[in-house]
Amino acid sequence: TEEVEVEPLTCTKFLPSLEGKYWDNEDEDISLTDAQRRYIKRSKILIIIIDKSSDEFAQYEMFQRLNTGGSHLSPQEIRNCIIVMKNEEFYKKLRDMSKYTNFINSVPISEKDSEEQGYLEFVVKFFILRYSKFDVSDSENYNNFLTDEILELINKNNIDFEEEKDIFQKTFDLLYEVMDENAFKKYDKEKNKSYGPVLVGAYEAIIPGLTANIDYYQENTEELSEVIKQVYS
């Protein structure tokens, strides 16, 4: 039989020393050790197939149960997986909106939150605040509520994304023009100064009324500034 030439291993992000190594080679410098080979042979890989046709809540619960060890996923990162499985095009539109410059400028979250898909979560909340009949802040299980509601919107398939994108951009253009990066930060009336991190509660309080009356507030920017400041009084 023809002898097959064995290719060397290639490195990974977390195992760079694998580069150029062989499973078993006479040259010890480029070969895995006996102990390393035994460890690999005895290791187990858990594979669970989550069917696209499965109930969405069951999928979310399964992702949560699997979300142990290794790199921990944020609730929004898990939610992204479910949204992609349900409607990839819908996910891409949410993702594109999350990259809008004045949205990012108006919602200055931490680098860690950004890496954990925090901006995309705020876009999800934008839609839920505009379309949901329930009070987001009163939900007993907040993350499950967000997942259920965004999947319900996907199922209904009645969102005019061009119109929503226009309202979204007008909203955050206006917020950044009027409040700079301070619209969702606590306002101190005595010091006439905003400070601290972005407050989710402020976002949930401001967005519904502003988006419903965006044309009015575009013509009445001083009133908008006062309305936002009153949220923190």
Where are these regions (language model features)?
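Basic- and aromatic-enriched surface patches that contact anionic nucleotides/nucleic acids
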Residues: E2-N144, Q218
